[in-house]
Regions:
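C-terminal accessory/connector segments of nucleic-acid motor ATPases
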Residues: 346-411
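Helicase motor core with emphasis on the C-terminal RecA-like subdomain
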Residues: 3-9, 13-17, 21-43, 50-53, ...
């Protein structure tokens, strides 16, 4: 039945690694935790069970833009779905809630904050919720890269329901410590845990310490002219500067960051998505839910603040399984930029001073490991796998540390 649902609604003939185990667990009412790298198809793991189980599935996600994309895709596949978040007007919210109460939807996406509103809580009491899926589940852990205190209250919401639904938790990047936190803090019951593995053999990893970062970037992009790729920058200002330089140099590039209007972001995203503009220059605001398989390179113009962030962003390359390059342009000044950003992150009003201090301490620890990746000798792939708790018995023989730039895919 799972295969039939997958084929009927999503047009796939077979499950990807790890998906079927997750689907079988959830449809047999066993909680599940899926740790699957970006592009492994996490959404199928809860969308297929949602269609097989009676009642309605609630999907908790902090990513408002991703919700809209997922719901649009589900609707086009003939699945009645909706989202409830702050992008709706009060009237739209009222109508969506009314339809939800009438049983019009099979899958409802909600922001975690929505669980705390009296109107949603009242609705949930009378709805037959059969599945509750938690996306970006690492947000529940102080040891995760993006701790959100509101996630700590998900378990209480579940406990308040008349009947406990089966729970699925999903994340792209979680160390062993974060996995244990997810199970404990979401109160998962004897979960089936699936880790599909972090190794992506088709990705070539390289760290370059250029004398001139702009010149190094231009050199790579000229070599890869016509190919689709993403250039990540640490700040909006850097995105603007880099994108302008590329355009002046005759490279067809567009930009994406949170400072642009919704309209401009959407337009630029579509240019990149549909191959009318091959190079996207962006902050980390770009990429969540972007389903583009032919990205041939991801270049980090500056060092990210953590291995979690780096691997999630680099992992947007080569999702079609073909060879792709992940190149980081490292400069010692990146450390000061990253430290400044950690120290000047807006304090989260839902956190105590002690929690904020603990999170900052963890952020600094993660930054130090990121610097190790850029500066210490040794296989880059092995470093990544060990960081995420996987066994890396030997060097890969296929990264800049193992064999220098000579084994990059020079297309």
């Amino acid at each position: 039945q799972a295969q039939e649902t997958l084929r009927k609604y999503f047009g796939h003939e077979a499950f990807r690694p790890g998906q079927e185990v997750m689907v079988n667990a959830l449809t047999h009412h066993r909680d599940a935790l899926g740790v699957m790298p970006t592009g492994a198809g996490k959404s199928m793991c809860y969308q297929v069970p949602a269609l097989m189980l009676p009642g309605v599935a609630i999907v908790i996600s902090p990513l408002i833009s991703l919700m809209a994309d997922q719901v649009a895709a589900l609707k086009s596949a003939g699945v009645p779905a909706a989202y409830l978040n702050s992008s709706l007007t009060p009237r739209q919210m009222e109508l969506a809630m009314q339809r939800a109460r009438q049983g019009a939807y099979k899958i409802i996406y909600v922001a975690p904050e929505r669980l705390e509103t009296p109107s949603f809580q009242a609705m949930a009491q009378s709805m037959p919720i059969s599945l509750l899926a938690v996306d970006e589940a690492h947000c529940v852990s102080q040891w995760g890269q993006d701790f959100r205190p509101v996630y700590l209250r998900i378990a209480d919401f579940v406990d308040s329901l008349p009947t406990r639904p089966v729970m699925g938790a999903f994340t792209a990047t979680a160390t062993e410590r974060v996995r244990q936190d997810i199970i404990r803090l979401l109160r998962l019951q004897n979960p089936e845990t699936v880790t599909t593995g972090f190794d992506r053999p088709n990705l070539y990893f390289e760290v370059i310490r250029p004398k001139n970062r702009d010149a190094a970037l231009m050199d790579i992009l000229r070599r890869k002219r016509g190919e689709s790729g993403i250039v990540y920058c640490a700040t909006r200002k850097a995105v603007e500067q880099v994108c302008d330089k590329l355009i002046r140099a005759g490279i067809d590039a567009t930009r994406y960051h949170a400072g642009l209007s919704d309209e401009e972001r959407k337009e630029n995203q579509e240019k990149f998505q549909y191959d009318t503009c091959p190079v996207m220059v962006a902050t980390n605001a770009f990429g969540m839910g972007i389903d583009k398989s032919n990205v041939r390179f991801v270049i980090h113009y500056q060092m990210p603040r953590s291995m979690e962030a780096y691997y999630q962003e680099a992992g947007r390359a080569g999702r079609d399984g073909e060879a792709a390059e992940c190149i980081l342009l490292y400069n010692g000044s990146d450390i000061f930029t990253a430290k400044w950003m950690i120290e000047h992150t807006e304090p989260n009003e839902n956190m105590t001073a002690a929690e904020q201090s603990a999170v900052r301490y963890q952020d600094m620890n993660r930054l130090n490991r990121m610097v190790d990746y850029c500066t210490k000798p040794g296989c880059l792939r092995a470093f990544i796998l060990r960081y995420f708790g996987e066994n890396a018995a030997q060097d890969c023989g296929h990264c800049s540390a193992c064999c220098g730039a000579r084994c990059a895919i020079r297309t």
